[in-house]
């Protein structure tokens, strides 16, 4: 028989203790299904989590949002089994023995995904020793891989998880070169294994910032980028091998005037071969066109344009090139000379032209505030009601913070929606997720329900009803 619980009562269950082991178990199963290898040390831990892993969850009666741009489905059902979405929509049968959660009057959606962030790389920006967003004095650039620096315990991860964010694209910051290194896609689960895909893309700065990093001008930045890709193309490495300098033949001679180290050149091999995306940050329309022109010499490049404040001016070219864009939702100020044509209608105009657009948190003061992305998406919906402005439909706006970012990094077959086979990242809301007053009631990542507790809720609870003379002397996250 199935058991029935409301979202509120589900939250009262002791989910935190199970999440760590259950999510490790499910991640191991997911990786095995994809041909991955399970570490022996992890396997010994996973033996304790078998009961939680076998659970099937049925969320019934809610307003279901698939996340693919379509309209919400009233009275829908979502089935999660073994960490994956099995079915979602109307008329879905509830499997025998499933834990049934009544979501009547609630909204049920895929977890939110940020198309660009730096979450997990720093707790406090001002503390340089613990800030891993950039490597200003490193001898390496393109070969840098941010995955080892991701810290799942930073407070921002739990805070954003409680707001319905389940995945994020995390990019490094360029410091002494146009190449910042290789970014990752992570989950915001409450365990020690946050990496969904490491080396998901190579991040490059062009435009004004790229010019500064390359020696003072855009001319230098483009010369450096093209030369780097040419050098990588000349390196002999077996096809299909990972980006590892050890794949280069030891006896291979490289020209004496090469600019890249063996490590950086090898890291760019997958980029030239089209096996790893090249994420390029540009804002100005002419800079976007120059980035697109790279495909003339390097036709296998899988470009992703980030920023694109003036993307609406070259939307036709972006669509023709079939290049996805990750943009700030509402940039409308000429903050620099490369953003003079900024407009809040940028995302809407690009989408209307057929460009695949996702929303990210690009401004330095918001790269860890992922929880505001649904507010930004809601504002894009509101723009459709303003004469002369171009926004997004509700379905398009939600897709821009769910399946859109996943598609941009080539992972929409794994995450970002409630289509069958996707990872079980599901959120129950008490109302429209694009409305400011709406709150999160429950979150699942990889099919495991997550704790919504975080540093902010602990502070709230501790000081909600203070008594005179009874205030603690200091706050400890372990209390």
List each model region and its residues.
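C-terminal cap of metal-dependent C-N hydrolases
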Residues: 62, 66, 71-76, 407, ...
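Divalent metal-coordination and catalytic microenvironments
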Residues: 62, 78, 83, 105, ...
